[in-house]
Amino acid sequence: MRKLFTSIYLWGIVIISFCSHTTNAQQLLNPRLQPQFVNQLPVPGVINGLSGGTFNINIRQFDQWLGLVDPITKQHLNTTVWGYNGSYPGPTIVAKKDIPISVYWHNNLVNGSNQPLPHLLPIDRSIHWAFGHDPNWQSYGVPVVTHVHGGHTESASDGLPDQWFTPDFAMKGPGFIKGDAQPFYYHNDQEAATIWYHDHALGVTRLNVYAGLAGYYIITDQNEMNLQAANNLPAAPYDLGLAIQDRMFTSSGQLYYPSTSEEEEEEEVPYPSILPEMFGDFILVNGMTWPVLDVEPRQYRFRVLNGSDSRFYNLFFSSGEQFIQIGSDQGLLPSPFTTNQMLIAPGERKDIIIDFSNPALWGQTIILKNNAKTPYPKGSAPDPLTTGRIMAFRINKPLDESYPLTTLPATLRPPIVPLQTELAPRKLILFEAEDEYGRLMPILGTVDDGILGFRDPVTENPAMNSTEIWEMYNETMDA
């Protein structure tokens, strides 16, 4: 053990070996024996909220083909997943600035007899989670609550971890306010941006999202619509989301989430046990393993989301093609900029343009690759044959001249006025401590107070409409 910060003792990062295809007596699919760049990129359906309205979105369990095959028979292997409105990823919600929408999120994780379904993945009940140590927890069903990540949302509709609920609202978290009698309300009072929605239930967020509960939430505004109308930005069908996620699968094609580490197998820790980080050995984009997209010789807009648990991606093209970044988490950049590679962290979004119009690309297949280490930035390099590959693009479709070509402008938005503040910066710290079982535990704190738990009194209470500077100090081994 090494003392790193104010009496905090840190473990070395737990790194799980995924070279073996047997984990805890569970046979796993070998990613090297699965097809790549054969199956077309799926495009989720759309919920059109441009004119406002109230929508019902159902969370259900179903089987979906994610591109997996039996390595011997080559027969398709379907995977049981969860999704919104029967889709993984969920449908893309499209809204417009200052036009609110309301959503009833229905927890329909029940069987044909309307009985609650068990979770698809092992739950560690030793951590702070929805049902605590209640011995009857399995009879209640799976807790869920949806959070719009990046949205400017009222607290009652924010999908806070304690706002969870089970099927038919039989059980509700202590923070539950809306969902049954009242829908979640989204003001959409922010500029055009690529944000996303995902489950956020206490203690099982990682598992519920891994099971499939995520989707895009796109906000547009008049500035962006003007750019599209002037053919300065690609619009549908040349405006697509790319949600990148890593997963592991059993030999029968079912989702697998590690529930103990090699280090913990010889120690007295609960089983199943939470892990501080999880890195899958399959890469999926929009719910398909290593897909391909056939494209025309023109500009495409891709809204890239890193929907993985812990994995960073440093993206680059096998052909050396460049990315033109036009937006980030919260909206359009002041002007486009060009780069040969693009780093994207879990939960982050990057809005990019790829120009396939170069005549030298016609008839070619180019591969989107990844070279980010796991854990980032000091861990192991990805397998160049699996996790080092994301998807492929085939430049083989004839140009559809009914859609005009686009030309990026020099500026994308009005200038951003720098914010000023005379308030002292708030200084917060990211720690890695140990829990009562000796497991690595990411946790927050402040420079003045050190480590703070979930139930500790609030320390950061900025005034409404104030401007502050928050300084984040990373004391973890990944820094």
Q: Language-model segments: which ranges?
A:
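Short Pro-Gly-centered flexible turn/kink motifs
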Residues: 101-103, 175-183, 345-354
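N-terminal, post-signal-peptide metal-ligating segments of extracellular/periplasmic oxidoreductases
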Residues: 25-148, 152-172, 181, 266-302, ...
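A conserved hydrophobic secondary-structure block that centers on an alpha-helix together
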Residues: 171-208
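Bacterial N-terminal signal peptides that target proteins for export
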Residues: 1-10
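Short, acidic/polar linear motifs in exposed loop/turn regions
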Residues: 109, 205, 308-310, 476-478
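Histidine- and aromatic-rich segments of cupredoxin/plastocyanin-like copper-binding domains
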Residues: 136, 153-170, 244, 248-252, ...
